[in-house]
Every structure is written in C-alpha cells, then in structure tokens.
Amino acid sequence: MDICGVDSEGKEFNSVQEMWREEIGEGDETKKTQWYRDGVSYWEGVEASVDGVLGGYGHVNDADIIGSEVFLKTLLQERLVNNVGANQHLVALDCGSGIGRITKNLLIRYFNEVDLLEPVAQFLDAARENLASAGSETHKATNFFCVPLQEFTPAAGRYDVIWVQWCIGHLTDNDFVSFFNRAKGYLKPGGFFVVKENLAKNGFVLDKEDHSITRSDPYFKQLFRQCGLHLYRTKDQKGLPQELFAVKMYALTVDTPPKIHRTRSKTRSNRPQIIK
C-alpha cells in the first residue's frame, strides 16, 4: 500500500508498511500485543464521562448524534424497512461503545436490542449504569462485552447493523481486514456496517500517545476493498470544530448495491487529535 504519513511527533514515513514495521515489527506478536495493551492503557487513564471519551470535546456530542441519526434513518428505510418490513426485531452492535454514549442517544431508539463492545472495563461499567434506566422492554441494551475489537467473535447472523465509530484506528491494517471479514458473518441478510471515523487529509497520522492511526479516505477505501465490502453510501459530518479532523460516515454492505451514493468531502488540516 503506497501511502505516506506522519506521526504526532512530526516523523515522516515513506509508506504505511514502514510505519507498521516500526510500531509492531514483522511477525512480532509480542510487539503487536504491546501496541494494543498501550492503547487500552491510555483510555484506562481517561475519565468515564462524555467529555472524557470525546477527548475534552464533550460539546460535539449533539452535532455528532444528529449527523449520525440523519444518516442512519435513511439507511434503515432503504436497507431494512423497504426490503424486510417495518415490524422486524432489529439488533445492533456498538463497537468501541465507551460509556454507551451512542447507544443511549441514538441506537437504543431505533433498535430493539443493542450489544455493546468495549475493551476498557471502567467505560463498560459506566455504560451499564448509564443505560440501566434507558430504553424500554422493547428497546434495550442487552449484552456488554469487555473484549478488544480484534478478538471479538459473537453469534453468527445476530446483527442488522454493526456500528463502528472512533475505534477502528486502534486496529492494525491486518486486524482491520480480519475483523470485517469475520464480522460479515455476524450480519443478518440485508444487514450493513456503519463506519464513522476521523479522516487524515492525506495518507495517515499516527498518534503516539493513544496508539491509534487516523487514515485518509483513500486509505479507508483500499482497506474496505480488501475486506470485500461495498460502499453503499457516504456522508460528511457537519458542525464540528475546525481544529478537529474531518469526520466521515461510510455505510458498507456485503452485497453489491445497485447504486453508490457519494458526497464530496471537505478536507481540513491534519491534527493529532483523536476523539472516541
């Protein structure tokens, strides 16, 4: 993959392969394990609050949820209601769920069940507490998995939607591809992925502090192709502070969509600022 990038300390890399060799070695499972351990350790030192998980930008929560809801409503209508019917029992997986922010403010209102996946125990404990009185008998958080994304293997065919937001940057490229290849089997027929992530203006930006990588749009699309996923629809998130990375939403399907919907992305300067 011929993609150049930089890290948060200003070091330049001529290729993504060069960066990964430095960070996780080649076939060095010990070094790769440490990469993941360091990433979790960073978040273990963060307060289990909206402001904490959003990197001090708690005020972006409303804009984020509004943008996600507009995107999700269209997808549910096109992909599920029109094809299966309005009365089916819908189940979602919230990947990198943190304290349950997205589940509480969005997913639990549209899905009958939501499972939460989060490797940081204190965040998941906070999610249980935050969601204890949220929803209803027919719209509720069901399972709380304290498992890293790269190790998660749920029941086959359980989910209508797998929501991946501000967490996939912690996975290496190989584990990114492995996760989505496994996750295809987690989806029900007609189900889809939503990936919502920060975008680097060019190439990639490696954050040395939290051990994550912010990928560019072409970088993401290369990885999606490697996963055998089809780009169904995209949308740029609006209303975020200028100093943050641009944020883009991708809807991805296993089946080939009849038409690909694209929107023109606005680019902003790279900033080593990761929000979760």
UniProtKB/Swiss-Prot annotation:
Swiss-Prot/TrEMBL catalytic activity: N-terminal L-alanyl-L-prolyl-L-lysyl-[protein] + 3 S-adenosyl-L-methionine = N-terminal N,N,N-trimethyl-L-alanyl-L-prolyl-L-lysyl-[protein] + 3 S-adenosyl-L-homocysteine + 3 H(+); N-terminal L-seryl-L-prolyl-L-lysyl-[protein] + 3 S-adenosyl-L-methionine = N-terminal N,N,N-trimethyl-L-seryl-L-prolyl-L-lysyl-[protein] + 3 S-adenosyl-L-homocysteine + 3 H(+); N-terminal L-prolyl-L-prolyl-L-lysyl-[protein] + 2 S-adenosyl-L-methionine = N-terminal N,N-dimethyl-L-prolyl-L-prolyl-L-lysyl-[protein] + 2 S-adenosyl-L-homocysteine + 2 H(+)
Top-level class of the enzyme under EC nomenclature: transferase
Signal peptide positions (record): none
Cysteine disulfide links: none
Keyword S-adenosyl-L-methionine found: yes
Pfam families listed in its UniProt record: Methyltransf_PK
InterPro entries linked to this entry: MeTrfase_NTM1, SAM-dependent_MTases_sf
Domain of life: Eukaryota
Listed EC numbers: 2.1.1.244
Single annotated GO MF: N-terminal protein N-methyltransferase activity
Binding site for S-adenosyl-L-methionine: 96, 101, 118-120, 149-150, 165
UniProt record, GO biological process: methylation
SUPFAM superfamilies for the chain: S-adenosyl-L-methionine-dependent methyltransferases (SSF53335)
Annotated keywords: Methyltransferase, S-adenosyl-L-methionine, Transferase
Role summary: Alpha-N-methyltransferase that methylates the N-terminus of target proteins containing the N-terminal motif [Ala/Pro/Ser]-Pro-Lys when the initiator Met is cleaved. Specifically catalyzes mono-, di- or tri-methylation of exposed alpha-amino group of Ala or Ser residue in the [Ala/Ser]-Pro-Lys motif and mono- or di-methylation of Pro in the Pro-Pro-Lys motif.
Similarity section: Belongs to the methyltransferase superfamily. NTM1 family.
Name of the protein in question: Alpha N-terminal protein methyltransferase 1
Lineage of the species this protein comes from: Eukaryota, Viridiplantae, Streptophyta, Embryophyta, Tracheophyta
